[in-house]
Amino acid sequence: MKDVIRYLAPVVACAILALPRIADAQSPTQIPPSITTPDKVDSRLGTLEFKDGAPSKATLDKVYDNLDFTYAFRAFTDNMRGVSIHAARKGLQSIGVKDNEVLIFSQLMDAKSLFLTANADTVYTMGVLDLTKGPMILEVPPKFLGTIDDYWFRWVIDIGPPGPDRGEGGKYLIVPPDYTGALPEGGFFVARARTTRVFWFGRAFLENKNDPKPAADTIRKFTKVYPYQAGGVGTPIAEFLAGKVMLGSVTPPPPTVFHEGSGKVMNTIPPNDWTYFEMLNEIVQQEPATSLDPELMGPIAAIGIVKGKPFAPDARMKKIMTEALAVANATSRSLFMSPRDPKWFYYPGSSWMNYLFETGYEFETPIPLITREGAKPFPPTGYRTMDARTNFFYGITGITPGMAMRLPGIGSQYLFALTDADKQYFDGAKAYSL
């Protein structure tokens, strides 16, 4: 027994010595203040309250109202471009121009037609291609400057001097998303769209002492819109013999329908009232679910606009979305009329600006420099300048690399100003000299 006690004594002593260390190991860790949430937080939403980190009912209401507000705000600022092109299509439809038909302003534009950035000294032509039944062909005339954008106003391909026809005119074959059918080996400038409809537009320049008639006549003579027939022109017989494609007929295309736009009353400008969300829903229902980046589609879905589902916000959401719409419109208009980034202006202190030189047509990387050795691209920035994109599509129609090229005689270069030499906004009731 003594031997047992003699054996256990050191063990008990060791256990007693170890007790403080066990107690130390079980004591709570000091929590850094940086990872805790205070019981009360003062914010622009008011006082937010948390009990042991758990939000109160009043806090939940404030936070979720604000979250839904931000989603509705972004649905406007990030996606105005889609509603803008939808509004343009609706404007054309309002005067009877259907998809795959052509609108031409033979006598130039005037104030009866509401467009964002139309000029009054070029002959405009435009239309919408419906790709739901397959690829469409657009034939364009020589000396015609234009572009094709998809239904989220993303660039597809240029027409004319900046495009593959280089001002000589030609046939453009526009292919819808997920098309797996046969395509020609030659004879067409082929471009794939990410949406089932695309908007094309361009202009011809005045000749013969500012007479628009020669340009308008050339447009009517050469412009054609018609469906692509697989296995026809552009498909060699060898492809058929190899079993790769069925032969199609080689027949003249159906006549293109033209509509006169000069003097017509139409509105192509996107709205900033509740109809904005209704039009945004129409686009989402019309286009493939994958037609827009998921990050951009996320806020749209968060406010209840989801492909294949009814858009029916309750009274709470409608109130929040209406307020967000007003703030988003005010923000977009402020960005357009008075940008805060000094790099967007042509030189320090100037009212003249064009941020595409700084951001490029994708609002990410400046346009390349043109040197004696050729084009000198800038490295990608890795981020998109969101304010520039919001600014651009709020006040301008169309996007293309050709809108910011340092190449004379190829594309277009723009400088615009919204204030006079005294930095006062232009007044439509006054006359100004340059």
What are the residue ranges of the model-derived segments?
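N-terminal secretory signal peptides that target proteins for export/translocation
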Residues: 1-7
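Bacterial N-terminal signal peptides
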Residues: 9-20
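A compositional/structural signature for long, glycine/proline-rich flexible linkers
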Residues: 25-434
